[in-house]
């Protein structure tokens, strides 16, 4: 995968050179290029200007972005604009991006964008209902979430297939050594070696955690018959506990 990032602050992306993203680059699975669009700005390297019609703040000018995009060699890239007014970023979207060969991220700053910049864009994406100073942190988050899904980046394919949200549910609790730490013991079922009992326990725990913490995820979740029976039992148990 090839990723190009348009930003005023390339140095902010230094953390991407480490951990999973750095390993993906070392394996030759990822190529990242940073483009400071101030280098393409006319008018004394100014990248922002006042909005027509008045208003608060400054807008990112179209010219530096267009000229930077013209300088990037890409055949058919997915162009992502980081914008708090964009569609929310989800795990399923990261899975979709992981299938692409070329991604371009445009990181804004200031009050907003000249609307004409959006003619270059295929996707307008937001991390959530809050506003950041710039798009860099959002881009890094999205890149990290996407790159780890590229085949062969992680050691085991199953290591991300069982992540929270990958199945549509939150992940079940997990434990490692020691068995007993400060009086807190690993559930007996995980020590039993009975794979079917462990599978059912994990399914129950995943459904229960999702129901208690993110019930909205269950509104669109496609339950199997087995999951539906377990989920109904969970709700009944919790309801009895409230009475």
Swiss-Prot record:
The keyword Cell membrane does not apply. It catalyses: guanosine(37) in tRNA + S-adenosyl-L-methionine = N(1)-methylguanosine(37) in tRNA + S-adenosyl-L-homocysteine + H(+). One of its GO terms (molecular function) is tRNA (guanine(37)-N1)-methyltransferase activity. Keywords: Cytoplasm, Methyltransferase, S-adenosyl-L-methionine, Transferase, tRNA processing. It is found in: Cytoplasm. S-adenosyl-L-methionine binds at residues 108, 127-132. It comes from the Bacteria. It holds the Pfam family tRNA_m1G_MT. One of its GO terms (cellular component) is cytosol. GO terms for biological process: tRNA N1-guanine methylation. Its EC number is 2.1.1.228. HAMAP family: TrmD. Homodimer. Belongs to the RNA methyltransferase TrmD family. Specifically methylates guanosine-37 in various tRNAs. NCBIfam families: PRK00026.1, trmD. This is tRNA (guanine-N(1)-)-methyltransferase. It comes from Streptococcus equi subsp. zooepidemicus (strain H70). The gene is trmD.
């Amino acid at each position: 995968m090839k990723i190009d990032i348009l930003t005023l602050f390339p140095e902010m992306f230094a953390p991407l050179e480490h951990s999973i993203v750095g390993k993906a680059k070392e394996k030759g699975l990822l190529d990242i290029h940073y483009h400071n669009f101030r280098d393409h700005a006319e008018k004394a390297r100014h990248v922002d200007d006042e909005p027509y019609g008045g208003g608060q703040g400054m807008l990112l000018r179209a010219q530096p972005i267009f000229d930077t995009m013209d300088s990037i060699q890409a055949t058919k890239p997915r162009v992502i604009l980081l914008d708090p007014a964009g569609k929310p970023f989800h795990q399923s979207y990261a899975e979709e991006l992981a299938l692409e060969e070329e991604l371009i991220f445009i990181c804004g700053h200031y009050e907003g964008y000249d609307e004409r910049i959006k003619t270059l864009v295929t996707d307008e994406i937001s991390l959530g209902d809050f506003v950041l100073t710039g798009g860099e942190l959002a881009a890094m988050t999205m890149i990290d979430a996407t790159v780890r899904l590229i085949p062969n980046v992680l050691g085991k394919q199953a290591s991300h297939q069982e992540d929270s949200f990958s199945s549509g549910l939150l992940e079940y609790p997990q434990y490692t050594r020691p068995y007993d730490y400060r009086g807190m013991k690993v559930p007996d079922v995980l020590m039993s070696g009975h794979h079917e009992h462990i599978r059912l326990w994990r399914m129950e725990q995943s459904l229960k955690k999702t129901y208690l913490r993110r019930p909205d995820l269950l509104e669109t979740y496609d339950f199997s018959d087995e999951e539906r029976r377990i989920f109904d039992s969970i709700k009944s148990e919790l309801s009895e506990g409230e009475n």
